[in-house]
Amino acid sequence: MGFLFRPKELPRPASLTFTLDQAGHTYDDGHVGLAPTDITISELRVAVIGLNGAGKSTLLGLLDGSLKANAGTVTIAGGEERLDPAVKKDAKRIDNLVGKVRREEIPNSYYKADSIREAIDEPLKKHKVPESERQAIIGNLFAHFDLAAVARESASALDSEKRHLLAIASALSFSPAAIVADEPTKGLDEVASAHVAKALFSYDKQVVFATHDTELITRAEYAIDRTLVVDDHQVVFDGGPHEAVAFYTDLIRAKYEAAKA
């Protein structure tokens, strides 16, 4: 299901190409989040797997512009645009082009709104989106993400599955070209996880996401094009989802055996 809101200033590309050219990030405390990495991502469905602390979130932060590379460069391209997150003007445009999802996190303002419909409507209103378009946007999102029945509920009244769905709907409310999602099904049981994944991957948007759910990425209906395995702050495998899961399983087994030795 596609989407209709488009800013008038610049055309919205159908998808993006993310390029890391020896790009890495070291945090202020000296901890290496991601070693210098060369990678280009243009596929529509890309998964990132790895153990806790391996560097997945840092990689996603470089892709969505929430982290700046302090080694190498990051370029985000779409249509005729080539954007550098380190450039202030480009960073603002990237915020518009890349929707960010962090588990079930939603803006704090959502908890202050009387309803989740109002919570999504208010930012659109502030950006002077006409009422007819706002209603179409919200109706589209709430129908697709199964939120219509709880539209008048407050964010705090939602269960975990609905909050995950709302987090994705929120990221899509300004119709970005791509979604970068850090563990969009974290903490959910098998049924709820499948519901959220189906809604996310059936929406007509490019998705780059991190997960620990290796079964999810190998399910044919989600059509994952490519999977990266991150370990020890670097990408150690880049290929198809089934091959990536086999590699990852062997990697974990080797770490376990080494720990026993």
Write out the residue ranges for each language-model feature.
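Q-loop/switch helix immediately C-terminal to the Walker
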Residues: E104, K112-K126
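Conserved ABC ATPase signature
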Residues: S154-L158
